[in-house]
C-alpha cells in the first residue's frame, strides 16, 4: 500500500508495510500515482500532456522514471506486500506478562476541571486515597506477573497523586528494596496538576521519577476556562511558576507539559507556542474526548481547522529548530530509521494485557478510562485477572482487528488506535473512532514531513540518513516482552 501527499513544498510517498519514505519531484509523484493502474505508454502520454512544455521532461526521462519506480517495487520499497496479518492473529494465543501499572493513588483532586473524564478524580465513584498496603500489594502483583521482564513501569495517577504523596514516597522506597531481591528495575512517572508542587516534590521526582507529566492547557485564558479550583478560581497563576522551577531543576531528565484542546481553542497551536515561550521544550497537546453533546466537544466543522493547525505547528517547529529554539511535540516523535519492531507496531500499547490500571481498592482495569465500568473489571491485585474473557478481548486489539482499517495507510503507526476512545465513541473496543483517526493521520503526515525536512538539511551537509523501517528488532520474535 502506498500513501502520497504534498506538504510544505515536499512531494512525499510512503510505502506502508516497508516504512520506506520517498521524496520526489512533481513528475515522479504523478508517475507513481498512475503506476498501479496504467501501462507505461499511458503514463508517458499523460505526463507529456501535462509536462511536455518543460525542457527537463522528455519521453526518455519519463520511461527512466517508470523503470525506477518498477525497481523500487521489485526491491520492496513501493507496494510492498503485507506479510504481517498472521503475526496479529498469533497475538490472541500468546502468553503475556504484565509490564506496567497505572496506579491510582488518589481518587480525589484539588481541582474541579469541567472537562475531566474522571469526574474530578472520583471515576464515578467515591473519593479515596490508596493505602500503603494496597500499593505494596500492587507492586508485588506486578513483580509476580512480569516474568523475565526486568524493566517495569509505574505511573502515579489520579485524581491528583500528590494528595497522597507520603504514601507514594513509602511505596517507591519499597520498590527500590524489591529491585535488588527480584532483579527488576522500576521506572516511575508522576502525572500532576502542579498545585501541590514544592521543593520536596521536586527533589523527590528528580531523584526517583523517570518521567513527569505536568498538566497545562496553554494560554492563561484557555487554561483557566476549565482548570479551576473548587472556589472557581483558575489555576494558571499558581502552577506556571511551580512548573518553571520544576523544569529548571529537572535538568536533562524527562518531562512533558500535557494539555487538552477543545472546541473553544481550535487554534491550539497558539497554546503550544505559549508553553514553548514560557521555556518548556517537551510538549504534548491532546484533543478532548467527551460526549458529543458537551459544549467543549470537537465538531466536524472543527476538523479542517485542526488539520491546518497541525500543519502550522509542524512548519513552526522546523523554523524554531533552525533558529536554535526548538521544542519537542509528543505526537511528532517518530523514528524512521529504527523505531519499534513490527510486533509492537501491530499490537500497540498493551492495555488490558501488559498494562493495567489499579484503583485505590486494588481492582484491576484495562487502563484508566475504563476505571469504574463494571463491564471491564478484570479482577484484583490479590486474585489476579479473573475476567479472562475481557483480557482476551484486549489481546485481539491490534492493527488488523478492524475490517475498516485493512486499507488504511496509517495502521502500522496507530497499531489499531486507542481502545478506550474506540469504546466511548462506538461502544466497542474494536470499533473505529473516525474523528480520532483523521487527526492521527494528519499528525503522522506532519511528523514524517518534519523528518524529511531534517534529512534534507543533513543531506545538504553531506550526511545521508536512509528513511526506512526494519520489520523487527528480533527482541520479541520468540514472544518475550520487549525490555
Which positions does each model-derived feature cover?
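Radical SAM enzyme [4Fe-4S]-AdoMet core and its adjacent flexible, acidic
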Residues: 63, 221-237, 244, 248-352, ...
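Conserved alpha-helical substructure of the radical SAM core
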Residues: 56-203, 207-208
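Acidic, low-complexity/disordered tracts enriched in E/D and polar residues
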Residues: 1-35
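Short acidic, hydrophobic short linear motifs in intrinsically disordered regions
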Residues: 38-54
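Radical SAM/AdoMet-radical enzyme domain recognition
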Residues: 135, 139-155, 164-288
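Local cysteine-cluster metal-coordination motifs and their immediate loop/turn environment
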Residues: 108-118, 366-369, 403-420, 474-481
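Short Fe-S-cluster ligation motifs
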Residues: 139-157, 394-396, 432-476
Amino acid at each position: 500500500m502506498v500513501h502520497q501527499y504534498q506538504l510544505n513544498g515536499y512531494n512525499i510517498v510512503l510505502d506502508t508495510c516497508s516504512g520506506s519514505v520517498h521524496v520526489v519531484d512533481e513528475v515522479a509523484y504523478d508517475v507513481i500515482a498512475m503506476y498501479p493502474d496504467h501501462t507505461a505508454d499511458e503514463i508517458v502520454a499523460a505526463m507529456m500532456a501535462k509536462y511536455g512544455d518543460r525542457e527537463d521532461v522528455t519521453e526518455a526521462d519519463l520511461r527512466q522514471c517508470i523503470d525506477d519506480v518498477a525497481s523500487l517495487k521489485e526491491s520492496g520499497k513501493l507496494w510492498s506486500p503485507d506479510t504481517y496479518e498472521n503475526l496479529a492473529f498469533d497475538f490472541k494465543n500468546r502468553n503475556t506478562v504484565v509490564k506496567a501499572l497505572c496506579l491510582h493513588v488518589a481518587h480525589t483532586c484539588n481541582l474541579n476541571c469541567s472537562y475531566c473524564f474522571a469526574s474530578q478524580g472520583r471515576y464515578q465513584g467515591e473519593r479515596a486515597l490508596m493505602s500503603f498496603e494496597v500499593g505494596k500489594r500492587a507492586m508485588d502483583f506486578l513483580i509476580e506477573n512480569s516474568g523475565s521482564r526486568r524493566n517495569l513501569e509505574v505511573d502515579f495517577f489520579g485524581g491528583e497523586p500528590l494528595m497522597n504523596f507520603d504514601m507514594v514516597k513509602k511505596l517507591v522506597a519499597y520498590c527500590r528494596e524489591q529491585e535488588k531481591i527480584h532483579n527488576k528495575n522500576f521506572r516511575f512517572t508522576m502525572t500532576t496538576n502542579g498545585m501541590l508542587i514544592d521543593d520536596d516534590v521536586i527533589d523527590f521526582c528528580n531523584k526517583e521519577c523517570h518521567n513527569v507529566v505536568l498538566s497545562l492547557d496553554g494560554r492563561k485564558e484557555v487554561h483557566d476556562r476549565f482548570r479551576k479550583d473548587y472556589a472557581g478560581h483558575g489555576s494558571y497563576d499558581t502552577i506556571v511558576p511551580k512548573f518553571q522551577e520544576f523544569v529548571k531543576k529537572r535538568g536533562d531528565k524527562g518531562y512533558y507539559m500535557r494539555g487538552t484542546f477543545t472546541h473553544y481553542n481550535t487554534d491550539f497551536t497558539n497554546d503550544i507556542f505559549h508553553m514553548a515561550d514560557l521555556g518548556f521544550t517537551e510538549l504534548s497537546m491532546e484533543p478532548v474526548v467527551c460526549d458529543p453533546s458537551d459544549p467543549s466537544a470537537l465538531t466536524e466543522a472543527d476538523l479542517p481547522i485542526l488539520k491546518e493547525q497541525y500543519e502550522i505547528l509542524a512548519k513552526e517547529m522546523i523554523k524554531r529548530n533552525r533558529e536554535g529554539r526548538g521544542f519537542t511535540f509528543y505526537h511528532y516523535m517518530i523514528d524512521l530509521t529504527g523505531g519499534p519492531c513490527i510486533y509492537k507496531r501491530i499490537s500497540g500499547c498493551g492495555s488490558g494485557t501488559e498494562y493495567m490500571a489499579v484503583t485505590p481498592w486494588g481492582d484491576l482495569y484495562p487502563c484508566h478510562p475504563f476505571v469504574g465500568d463494571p463491564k471491564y473489571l478484570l479482577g484484583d491485585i490479590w486474585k489476579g485477572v479473573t475476567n479472562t474473557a475481557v483480557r482476551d478481548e484486549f489481546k485481539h486489539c491490534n492493527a488488523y482487528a478492524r475490517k475498516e482499517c485493512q486499507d488504511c495507510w496509517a495502521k502500522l503507526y496507530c497499531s489499531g488506535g486507542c481502545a478506550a476512545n474506540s469504546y466511548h465513541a462506538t461502544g466497542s473496543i474494536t470499533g473505529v473512532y473516525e474523528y480520532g483517526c483523521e487527526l492521527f493521520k494528519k499528525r503522522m503526515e506532519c511528523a514524517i514531513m518534519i523528518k524529511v525536512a531534517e534529512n534534507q538539511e543533513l543531506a545538504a551537509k553531506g550526511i545521508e540518513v536512509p528513511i526506512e523501517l526494519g520489520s523487527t528488532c528480533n527482541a520479541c520474535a520468540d514472544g518475550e516482552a520487549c525490555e
